Amino acid sequence: MKASRFFIGTLKEAPADAEIVSHKLMVRAGMIRRVAGGIYNYLPVGLRSIRKVEAIVREEMNRAGAIELLMPAVQPAELWQESGRWEQYGPELLRFKDRKDNDFVIGPTHEEVVTDIARNQIKSYRQMPVNFYQIQTKFRDEIRPRFGVMRGREFIMKDAYSFDKDTAGLNESYRKMYDAYVRIFTRLGLEFRAVAADSGSIGGNFSHEFHVIADTGEDAIAYCPTSDFAANIEAAEALPLIAARAAPAEAMEKVATPGKAKCEAVAELLAIPLERTIKSIVLATENEGAEPTIWLIMLRGDHDLNEIKVSKLPGLKNHRFATEQEIVDWFGTPPGYLGPVGTKKPVKVIADRTVANMSDFVVGANEVDYHIAGVNWGRDLPEPEVADVRDVKKGDPSPDGKGTIDICRGIEVGHVFQLGTKYSEAMGATFLDESGKPQPMLMGCYGVGVTRILGAAIEQNFDDRGIIWPESIAPFEVVLCPMGYDRSDMVREAADKLYAELAAAGIDVILDDRGERPGVMFADWELIGVPHRLVIGERGLKEGKIEYQGRRDAEATLLPADEAAATVTEKIRAALAH
């Protein structure tokens, strides 16, 4: 490829709406241009990287035995109504009517369509296992699209769906996809972690997320540096304390805490550790034809509520936060001074595991400007219902018993689920087993965010000059920068020869023959992030040398001109040999 015949749309400044590094650099490097909120054109530089991601994904999916197909982006509402997700999915599902007033959606995922394929095409256990996949454009109507391709509305995704006759088969399909994802993200050259996760709106029994580690990641990941444990903070278990609860040492006492509605302020006023205060969170669940059930969730003052865990508790699947009026009606006081002692109406109390182990703690007195100190279970309050309802935090014991938890940030780029029979039962996708009896198919689904990978890779690989691509997904692997290509026969001949040698070796090379000044050339290719650069100039050629600099290198080095192609080829192949 010669740069004069390619489109290079670099910019000096990032758009005002770009908040994170990847968004700024993708625009400045000429990879994307905004069409509407969360919708982008992928310009030639960006498309080259997308195609490389797709190629790696496709190779590993095929290697794992998955079979590629292509399903429509537009899906009839009837399929979504069958699965129940027409009502469940919410406003992120883009719905529309055709000219005949039929309801359709633009697919954010394809569970319904692929289940429809399976129920019509798979009749016997002999036809399984089978795993279908596609690489296709999706649409989710995000309420606030931002961060460029990281949270867009339209995006490219690889989604795969496995069908098995039994749990053993599903487990094997899941393992193959998990292993394929490890190979994919390793080949992409990314630092990543596979973490245990919640299945979310997709549903199902068992799932893992694959996160690229980056400080700007939206997701918090709990991991153990001394073991393989890693989990999304929503799914990481906070273990119960091993030590027995201490015996009461204080009498229960009402204390004045004027204007101190936060645990931190109460702890400071009373000169006690924050860990001795209780954070009271009030939830409500609806009862048809009757007043709601009010729940008091008790957390230690330095802990945070985990709503995912709460939603899995009996009776709390469809919980909401109580209104201020409900809080006043049940507790007799507005938020800030709430507690389990002396409520106006009965409430259901759930104590986090840590709270259940506390003694002589401080709670709200259900009276403005007052708290109660020295509260103890069994003596002042009945023993509570106990559950894990908090986020883990740094320093907590690891659930695998092999160290303590640390927290990092991650960008989700892949997700694998065991769906079980969620969709097959809802949509009647059955097969005849060995005895001729109909059974529901067991499903798994497996997604990779192709376009999101680009943003995540940049968040992990950049400097003040621009992107630093891993070789596997760089738009070009090496750029040739000739000094005076249009003025010097020596330079032009050497550059053309080097270009031909690299191309013959299968290297993805671009020759910058635009006639730009060296500073402009270097700035463009550093911004775009090409991993290897060779500079060809008359002075160096007279000495038999060509200048080489890797994108991560602080300084350039000189290579023998007749060895430059082989040296760079070896560097690239070594980088790709994961």
Curated annotation (Swiss-Prot):
A Gene Ontology BP annotation from the UniProt entry: prolyl-tRNA aminoacylation
Cellular component aspect of the GO annotation: cytosol
EC number(s) per entry: 6.1.1.15
InterPro entries, per the entry: aa-tRNA-synt_IIb (IPR002314), aa-tRNA-synth_II (IPR006195), aa-tRNA-synth_II/BPL/LPL (IPR045864), Anticodon-bd (IPR004154), Anticodon-bd_dom_sf (IPR036621), Pro-tRNA-ligase_IIa (IPR002316), Pro-tRNA-synth_IIa_bac-type (IPR004500), Pro-tRNA-Synthase_IIa_type1 (IPR023717)
Matches recorded under Gene3D superfamilies: Anticodon-binding domain, Bira Bifunctional Protein, Domain 2, YbaK/aminoacyl-tRNA synthetase-associated domain
Catalytic activity: tRNA(Pro) + L-proline + ATP = L-prolyl-tRNA(Pro) + AMP + diphosphate
Record localization: Cytoplasm
SUPFAM superfamilies the record matches: Class II aaRS ABD-related, Class II aaRS and biotin synthetases, YbaK/ProRS associated domain
One GO MF term: ATP binding
A Pfam family this chain is assigned to: tRNA_edit
Keywords, comma-separated and alphabetical: Aminoacyl-tRNA synthetase, ATP-binding, Cytoplasm, Ligase, Nucleotide-binding, Protein biosynthesis
Domains as described in the record: Consists of three domains: the N-terminal catalytic domain, the editing domain and the C-terminal anticodon-binding domain.
Function: Catalyzes the attachment of proline to tRNA(Pro) in a two-step reaction: proline is first activated by ATP to form Pro-AMP and then transferred to the acceptor end of tRNA(Pro). As ProRS can inadvertently accommodate and process non-cognate amino acids such as alanine and cysteine, to avoid such errors it has two additional distinct editing activities against alanine. One activity is designated as 'pretransfer' editing and involves the tRNA(Pro)-independent hydrolysis of activated Ala-AMP.
HAMAP family linked: Pro_tRNA_synth_type1
Similarity comment: family membership: Belongs to the class-II aminoacyl-tRNA synthetase family. ProS type 1 subfamily.
Subunit structure: Homodimer.
This protein's name: Proline--tRNA ligase
Gene source species: Burkholderia ambifaria (strain MC40-6)
